[in-house]
């Protein structure tokens, strides 16, 4: 009977904190109302959430260039989640952003106030060596409660980790580790050789260059929304795997490559190709960074390849021009979205001497989307060939 009363109280409190179509829960009240052990295990460290989903912050010093990146990271998260940011040095729960004299890029996991009953205090976020907007989104994601993707409790299903470094150990599933699929391309993933060569390899080696990429993914924001209980009272009929955006309930959050309020539009300056038969067609497409409001610091050019209904679209790369080969392909690269879940990051290519450059990519998606991304104004280009087939053809 006591547990039933606690459960009813928790439900009442949950609905009492829903406003403007969004759910922003006060974890203190829920914990006080419904605290039996099973729920504590399920929502482990729930007290590290920011109260009502509001992140209070202030700058401890000045650096206009870094501050601009911080503000862009804040805007990106706010535009895709119900999390709100408030610049307030005197808030009882706040993060101090330090941009000088530290040469670090790091943050504590979770909000200040580790006790459920006292969500107060201050933590520091060090951002002087954060060199991309995605890196700062990574640190804010820590502050919001996310651990690294490579420490998920299910990571051994996707990676072989041999390092004994303490920070690489698997984490329990209580935070945002299990609110969406494992993703090698997550902004929360380190590059494969962070702890030394061969210490953190993906089981699918085509993903090795993808690990450590600093584009913010569809699932990166989805997991935050799931963890904070972000939702809209009215759900839109979003297309292509999108969902109603808890930042603005009149539009959808869309997977990469889909645009418009309902995710049913394509990029205006995109390339649209038709695979007309099973003969290979070749094309070279240029791409480069250009400023775009609300971006994660990268600009993407999208290619849409359409084939015959129920056919397989095959794509193979023939050349990369001025695409910079780095761990994590962090400057520019090519992503052919061929995975069954088109919302998840497929293997990224930026090196001609490493997998999966020589692969024949086979996709059942119609259209199949290719993303050419860059954060440099240096003109780059990719040459590839494509076709459709009803057979699983392997090039010799």
UniProtKB/Swiss-Prot annotation:
BP terms from Gene Ontology: molting cycle, collagen and cuticulin-based cuticle; proteolysis
GO molecular function annotation: metalloendopeptidase activity; zinc ion binding
Catalytic residues of the enzyme: 139
Documented EC number(s): 3.4.24.-
Family annotation (Pfam families): Astacin
Boundaries of every EGF-like domain copy: 225-264
Function, as annotated: Metalloprotease.
Protein name: Zinc metalloproteinase nas-19
Native source organism of the sequence: Caenorhabditis elegans
């Amino acid at each position: 009977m006591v547990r039933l009363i606690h459960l009813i109280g928790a439900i009442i409190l949950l609905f009492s904190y829903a406003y403007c179509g969004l759910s922003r829960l006060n974890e203190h009240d829920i914990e006080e109302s419904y605290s039996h052990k099973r729920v504590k295990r399920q929502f482990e460290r729930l007290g590290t959430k920011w109260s009502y989903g509001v992140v209070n912050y202030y700058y401890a010093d000045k650096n206009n260039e870094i501050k601009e990146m911080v503000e862009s990271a804040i805007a990106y998260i706010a535009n895709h989640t119900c999390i709100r940011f408030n610049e307030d040095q005197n808030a009882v729960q706040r993060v101090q952003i330090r941009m000088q004299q530290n040469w670090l890029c790091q943050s504590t996991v979770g909000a200040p106030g580790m006790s459920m009953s006292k969500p107060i205090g201050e933590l520091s976020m060090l951002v002087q060596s954060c060199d991309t907007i995605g890196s700062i989104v990574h640190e804010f994601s820590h502050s919001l409660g996310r651990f690294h993707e490579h420490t998920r409790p299910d990571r051994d299903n996707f990676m072989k980790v041999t390092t004994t470094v303490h920070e690489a150990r698997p984490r329990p599933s209580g935070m945002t580790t299990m609110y969406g699929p494992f993703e090698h391309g997550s902004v929360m993933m380190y590059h494969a050789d962070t702890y030394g060569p061969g210490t953190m390899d993906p089981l699918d080696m085509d993903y090795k260059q993808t690990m450590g990429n600093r584009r913010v993914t569809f699932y990166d924001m989805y997991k935050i929304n799931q963890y904070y209980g972000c939702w809209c009272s009215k759900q839109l009929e979003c297309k292509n795997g999108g969902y109603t955006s808890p930042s603005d309930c009149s539009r959808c959050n869309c997977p990469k490559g889909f645009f418009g309020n309902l995710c049913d539009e394509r990029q205006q300056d995109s390339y649209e190709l038709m695979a007309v038969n099973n003969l290979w067609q070749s094309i070279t497409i240029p791409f480069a960074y250009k400023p775009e409001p609300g971006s994660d610091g990268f600009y993407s050019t999208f290619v849409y390849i359409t084939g015959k209904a129920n056919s397989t679209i095959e794509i193979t790369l023939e050349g990369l021009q001025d695409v910079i080969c780095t761990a994590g392909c962090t400057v520019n690269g090519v992503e052919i979205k061929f995975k069954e879940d088109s919302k998840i990051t497929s293997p990224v290519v930026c090196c001609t001497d490493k997998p999966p450059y020589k692969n024949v990519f086979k996709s059942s998606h119609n259209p199949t989307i290719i993303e050419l991304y860059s954060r440099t104004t240096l003109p780059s280009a990719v040459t590839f060939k494509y076709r459709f087939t009803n057979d699983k053809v392997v090039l010799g």
